[in-house]
Amino acid sequence: MKIDMKIKTYIGIFTIMVLLVAAKGDRPAYRVFNGKGHAADYGDILKAARNADVVFFGESHTDPICHWLELQLAKDLYEGKNGHLIIGAEMLERDNQLLLNEYISSMIRKKDFEAEAKLWPNYKTDYAPIVDFAANKGLKFIATNIPRRYSAIVNLKGLEGLDSINALERGMMAPLPLKYNPELACYKKIGEMVAGSPMHMGENLPKAQAIKDATMAWFILKNVNEGYVFFHINGSYHSDNHEGIVWYLKEYNKRNATELKILTITAVEQNDLDELEKDNLGKADFILCIPGDMTQTQEASAIGIAMPPAGITPATPMKDAKADTIKKAAPDSGSGGDDDDDD
């Protein structure tokens, strides 16, 4: 009897220990939710992406999980679409397209491309893998972003500052005059963050963001191909809430008879991955939820991110956020990865 009781006690203790370990379980590097906050997984993303015309991956620029999943999704789309894949990225600007084409077609060496192209400081760790994948498979890769010198002009002088540029220069950006909607939430937030800053930056910084969004949308649309998926990588703020690039893409596509099937993915940070926080609901068709203490490939400041990380808004104070934003958005801030937009 005593032996049975001891056995039961040991079994009870063992069961509790197992339950405690199980409760801790694996520590997931990410969780996926759909826009309504329901649990999803990578397979759901891939299935939806295969059926889309354009897929936006809104990343956090220095997050390793984002970069790894971008590469995996590109590989799986390549296989699932029998090679019918086009890739584009915010991180490469229009005046780099010729160099990019030469590298993709093996006309020039990788080291020559990397030496001559304007690349972000985290290019080798974060973006080279997907560019190299495209090169190895002979995929079309589109440098979608406006050259930063032109967005810097807008940041200084407003959209009117582009009136004097020539036809060749205009070919590297969205058609002018630009349709700009200051009431879009993504632009209003930027304006609020730099309100009261010098040199009309509160007014012009959202316009600089808009010319980037419009240019990326324009060159995505110019390269969309029936039966192909156009997979575009950009900072999350550029496509969150189906605004930014997505809004311009829909505007430019209105002249076409066929509506584009657009899928958006965004990355957010949360301390608790068990459920999607209310503020992150509806940001995209799929939300990639990453631990708040995830290690980063570089400090955000090292690549010139001007706006605060994903999830930080004007209503969520960040130490010296406004001062830091203004400093990084200064007229001569053309160095670094991104001179006048967010992550």
State the predicted function of each range.
Residues 1-2, 340:
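Short hotspots in intrinsically disordered terminal tails
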Residues 2-11:
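Bacterial N-terminal signal peptides that target proteins for export
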Residues 11-13, 329:
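Composition-driven detection of intrinsically disordered, low-complexity segments
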Residues 14-23:
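Hydrophobic h-region of N-terminal signal peptides that target proteins for export
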Residues 22-343:
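Compositional signal for N-terminal targeting/processing segments
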